Amino acid sequence: MTQDYKLQVEAIKCGTVIDHIPAQIGFKLLSLFKLTATDQRITIGLNLPSKRSGRKDLIKIENTFLTEQQANQLAMYAPDATVNRIDNYEVVKKLTLSLPERIDAVLTCPNSNCISHNEPVDSSFTVKAQRGEISLKCKYCEKEFDHLAVLHAD
């Protein structure tokens, strides 16, 4: 028995595909990591069916390639995501994500008293992973937060 599968999001010729993003996280990743700061076409799939997790988000950015450092920063919120480099409609490289040691100039400290809110400094967090839990420690106020608290601290 054969089954026909139809792409729900158009293929790209050249660029980056971030796949297997947890559902409801795709838009936040676009915003946090400034993935829309480009003139290139971006295709977003939200709540797509996934055999792995039931539902997923997907981001395709044409003619743009993420560095390994940029891809690893995504791992904090989409640890099972895959980041694929596409060339001539083919996957030419798959990046394996791992948590970075630091994340700079991306996130906002949830502590409203932190100097990073009032001084001209870039935010900076040390990433800590223990027993499957991810936390972030602010360089300035030295408070530690669950990574999801920082995700929603805009």
Curated annotation (Swiss-Prot):
Entry cofactors: Zn(2+)
Gene3D superfamilies: Aspartate carbamoyltransferase regulatory subunit, C-terminal domain, Aspartate carbamoyltransferase regulatory subunit, N-terminal domain
InterPro entries, per database record: Asp_carbamoyltransf_reg_N (IPR020545), Asp_carbamoylTrfase_reg (IPR002801), Asp_carbamoyltrfase_reg_C (IPR020542), Asp_carbatrfase_reg_C_sf (IPR036792), Asp_carbatrfase_reg_N_sf (IPR036793)
GO biological process terms, semicolon-separated: 'de novo' pyrimidine nucleobase biosynthetic process; pyrimidine nucleotide biosynthetic process
Molecular-function GO terms, alphabetical: metal ion binding
First and last residue of the signal peptide: none
Free-text comment on the cofactor: Binds 1 zinc ion per subunit.
Superkingdom: Bacteria
Residues where Zn(2+) binds: C109, C114, C138, C141
GO cellular component: aspartate carbamoyltransferase complex
SUPFAM superfamilies (alphabetical): Aspartate carbamoyltransferase, Regulatory-chain, C-terminal domain (SSF57825), Aspartate carbamoyltransferase, Regulatory-chain, N-terminal domain (SSF54893)
Annotated keywords: Metal-binding, Pyrimidine biosynthesis, Zinc
Entry's family note: Belongs to the PyrI family.
Function statement: Involved in allosteric regulation of aspartate carbamoyltransferase.
Assembly and binders: Contains catalytic and regulatory chains.
Full protein name: Aspartate carbamoyltransferase regulatory chain
Source organism (scientific name): Yersinia pseudotuberculosis serotype O:1b (strain IP 31758)
